[in-house]
Amino acid sequence: MGKNERNDQKGSAILNEKDAFSNRREPLGRRPMSPGRALCLGFLALILLGGLLLTLPAASAGGESIGFLKGLFTATSAVCVTGLSLIEAGRDLSLFGQIVLLCLIQVGGLGFMAFATLGMVLIGRRISLHSRILLSESMNQNGLSGMVRLSLWFFAMALAIELTGAALLALRLVPRYGTARGLWLSLFTAVSAFCNAGFDLFGNGSSLLAFRQEPLVLWTVIGLIQLGGMGFAVMLELLRHRKSLGRLSLHTKLVLAVNGILLLGGSLAVFLLEGQNPATLGREGMTLWDKVTGSVFQAVTCRTAGFAAVSQDAMNDSTKLLSCLMMFVGASPASTGGGIKTTTLAALLLLVHSVVRGRDRITAFGKEISQETGRRAVALTFIATSFVLAVTCALSILERRHGVSLTNLVFETVSAVSTTGLSAAGTGTLRRSSQILLMPLMYLGRVGPLTLATALIRRERDGARNRVHFPEEKIMIG
């Protein structure tokens, strides 16, 4: 029996175990909550709790509540690691409010189930099968064995990366802001960057514009964003097989390939489109190295991070549309980022390639990708695209009297659904109804369109109904 066949049987056994658990009947005849629904409700509960905490007067720098809408919007953006905001966190939030915001970012980025597992391990409680299934779902893993150990490794790795990033940022921020504030800004920025959140405490909506000619700051943030968006499973596999890269899994190879293409291609495109723009990379005093750094930073940050080293509104429309495409793709599975994910794009392109070449199978790097994966990639992309189009149309109606361009509305919508957090229109300047509309969009982007759809719609199990076959008939396509 080959290795792939054994893996397929193992994966089928795990899926059957999950289905059996979901179908198991309780003594009162009630089915336990499905993992997808539990995750959706868990994130929703975390958002509501965070919104209430941020609404407290103690969370405000002025001692008065920032208001429920602003508190809820900020909590949604933080838990969904987006970065869109109606407030200036560094100016409007007290130290308590900033700590709450940082905790929401960290829990939202690494996953609340991972934190719950850590808590149960620390107090010595046994991790139940249901908790292991939820942990597996939240971390986008197929297996159940070793999940607790894997989640603890994730925590250790995340902490090490964030502290290293904070130490590097402190080399520039401490001399500029003083020891106490500089260290706090370094830690907050490092966590926000690794979690692909995009929140900052520098104030005045400037994000990292003040550091556009500070290579150490920008490259440190680039590294944190890339590591957070790569996915923990990929990082672990690279560490395990660092001396034998030929043994890497198909998943890791696709992640690295797509990420490399988007990074190099996106950086080059931004450099060509914005290199002569006096409002962005072509401003006076920018050296060639500054332009290269700014181009790479824009190509990386629009992959769901949300930090800005150039004014997003001042970019050319062509650059905004390019950024929308990169935001829509986003990061990789089992990462802190959003978007449809790099592997989804890879599966789509490989599916199209197989259709054009007249092949029945989807292949890459000498391996075959299942038809189910191809169907899921198409479904995920279709659902996400539908939401982008629907919300963009709604925003264009709501903002028709405010003079916001369609390009900026598309940018805002894609930024929300991909949990990126970049804004060209200025989220705080939109109508209240538009701001409310963006909140469920950020939530959708964090839990995932397919996860939310399966949580709301009862899926048919592999029963008699699924085994019914109808007569096949061809229709015309294209």
Where are these regions (language model features)?
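Membrane-proximal intracellular helices of multi-pass ion channels
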Residues: 1-478
